[in-house]
Regions:
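Extended hydrophobic/aromatic-rich secondary-structure runs
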Residues: 1-2, 132
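Conserved NTP/Mg2+-binding pocket subregion across the NTase superfamily
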Residues: 3-117
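Conserved nucleotidyltransferase catalytic core and NTase-mimicking acidic/glycine-rich helix/loop elements
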Residues: 73-214
Length: 214
């Protein structure tokens, strides 16, 4: 039985959540249409289309899923298709799509953060910092040929799994998060250091030229 339930939730796609009364475990179920999930995977692994942050999350979901019931074998077939090497074209496209929005184009996130700091707009600083980090991690995981695990424990996942990490990765990330919480001008310096170290790594790996780093 459930001690509390929230059913037929429409907010982040159809889903149900409840607390399992005997254990207190929170059960979280999200429903995906089979055709929709297929389209997401083919868009990624066949067509190699990048997104702005979180590009390979559904691929990661598929790869790490445990099949409990699959009477037609549909999910197993899709999972077998997904168990492939990281496509190099996809890797390059994720980086080339997400890297410029960090600070390489006029409306880049770093520039939006600078303007928000000047306005004293703490909500906007928080919002734009989150967007910057979404693309930052998309670039980092693509560089390492890792599927993106989603929004939780990203730093821990990177530290455990990324063979290639920017210099001062953990310190830079913590500095950005701490400074952005107060919308201090220090956030601009922290973002610059974070992105400088990412660009140094990308340049060393031959992924971008020096002229692309700013």
């Amino acid at each position: 039985g459930a001690s509390r339930a929230s059913l037929d939730l429409p907010y982040w796609g159809p889903g149900d959540e409840w607390y399992h009364a005997p254990t207190g475990i929170e059960v979280d179920i999200v429903y995906f249409e089979a055709e929709w999930m297929e389209a997401q995977i083919y868009r990624l692994l066949r067509d190699h289309q990048p997104s702005l942050g979180y590009t390979t999350c559904f691929w990661h979901t598929l790869l790490t899923s445990i099949v409990l019931h699959d009477p037609r074998g549909w999910f197993t077939r899709l999972q077998d298709f997904a168990r492939q090497d990281y496509p190099e074209t996809l890797r390059q496209r994720i980086i080339s799509f997400n890297h410029p929005v960090l600070r390489g184009v006029i409306p880049a996130y770093a520039h939006q953060i600078e303007k928000a700091v000047r306005r004293g707009d703490r909500v906007s600083v928080n919002h734009r910092t989150a967007a910057l980090l979404a693309s930052y991690f998309d670039v980092l995981f693509a560089l390492n040929r890792l599927s993106h695990p989603g929004e939780k424990r990203l730093a821990d996942f990177a530290l455990r799994n990324c063979k290639l990490l920017p210099d001062q990765f953990e310190a830079d990330l913590n500095a950005v998060l701490l400074a952005s919480a107060s919308a201090s001008p220090d956030v601009n310096l922290a973002v610059t250091r974070l992105l400088d170290h990412l660009d140094e790594l990308l340049e060393n790996e031959g992924v971008i030229a020096n002229s692309e780093s700013l």
